[in-house]
């Protein structure tokens, strides 16, 4: 995959963004393996999905990184069509050579898919001296979600959930 990125820091943008201002060409190749035993892709009631992936950027272009990730989820259909599920994921990204991991390659958590209750991309390291209250992204992340859902009427469910997770600044820092 070949992608073009532009970071255009303006006005009172944190210094961290100014340091990465410019155009980037990213060439990326990724290999993944997935096992999916869920009974449905949308609103599964039983089974699981497990995925491992590895990626490499730097076959030309300006971005020189590699990444690894693992994600898994499992669903149990209990009495009365209630469902208990666990969803978890871990990832890491690092650079090679004399390059840094650009902000668009860094890891973040937050939002409806991994850390509900937090704003999108709000869970990540930040350095007040460099970026004020803006997150700078990290190089290692982990999250785990527990959810129990109860049917209200057909196709409508109410859920109770508990999400945990973290993002660290260093690669392979779990």
Regions found by a protein language model. Give the residues of each.
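C-terminal outer-membrane beta-barrel translocator/porin domains of Gram-negative envelope proteins
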Residues: 3-155, 160-172
């Amino acid at each position: 995959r070949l992608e073009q990125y532009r970071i255009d820091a303006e006005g009172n943008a944190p210094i961290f963004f100014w340091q990465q201002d410019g155009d980037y060409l990213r060439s990326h190749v990724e290999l993944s393996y997935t096992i999916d035993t869920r009974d449905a892709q949308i609103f599964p009631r039983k089974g699981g999905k497990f995925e491992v992936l590895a990626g490499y950027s730097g076959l030309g272009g300006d971005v020189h990184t590699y990444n690894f990730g693992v994600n898994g989820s499992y669903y149990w259909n209990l009495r009365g069509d209630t469902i208990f599920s666990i969803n978890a994921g871990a990832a890491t990204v690092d650079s090679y050579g004399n390059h840094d991991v650009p902000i668009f390659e860094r890891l973040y958590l937050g939002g409806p898919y991994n850390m509900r209750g937090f704003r999108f991309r709000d869970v990540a390291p930040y350095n007040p001296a460099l970026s004020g209250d803006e997150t700078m992204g990290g190089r290692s992340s982990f999250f785990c979600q527990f959810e129990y859902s109860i049917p209200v009427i057909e196709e409508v469910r109410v859920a109770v959930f508990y999400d945990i997770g973290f993002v660290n600044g260093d690669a392979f820092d779990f």
